[in-house]
Amino acid sequence: MSETTCHMSISLDGFVAGPDQSLEQPLGRRGIELHRWHLDEPLHEADARARDLLLRPRGAYVMGRNMFGPIRGPWQGDWRGWWGDEPPYHAPVFVLTHFEHEPIELAGGTTFYFVGDGFDVAFARASEAAGGRGVDIAGGASTVRQALASGVIDELVLDFVPVLLGSGERLFDGVADPRLEPVEVIHSPLATHVRYRVGR
């Protein structure tokens, strides 16, 4: 049976992005600090293991509009995502939005589909497109909260980074206890990576 996964870097005070996200600062103020563990080479052995989990191939992805780009309201211009002409997904990506948009097909097998009918519809479409190869909930925080509320996540990996952001996008606000069971813990000087099974 295919599994639904989610992998998020998080501050010690529970934020997955800093405040004031923008085109210039996609992760908000200081948000980049949450990702140094997999951006700064050479990687510690534990961080390399966690990055392998982050980049493992999946059959399809679900993400929020905020994850896809900084534009709010009706679509403007020809924005195609943060990742250039060949995004790292190599699979269909279903983007939650309140505004219609034609699919965007890019190199390497990534096509962004825009879904205005809510999380459950987007997840159902992603599951069908994945063809048994599993779905990943790619973020951001609001989309992960919806996925947890819907009970579809089987495995959640959290990369705890020893910083305090103070404000921004909290991951677990308003989320009922998902009954997380740790199954693997690895750590480096930059982060502690915990892989959880999610209860039902």
Model-predicted segments: where are they?
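Enzymes that bind and transform nitrogen-containing heteroaromatic metabolites
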Residues: 1-200
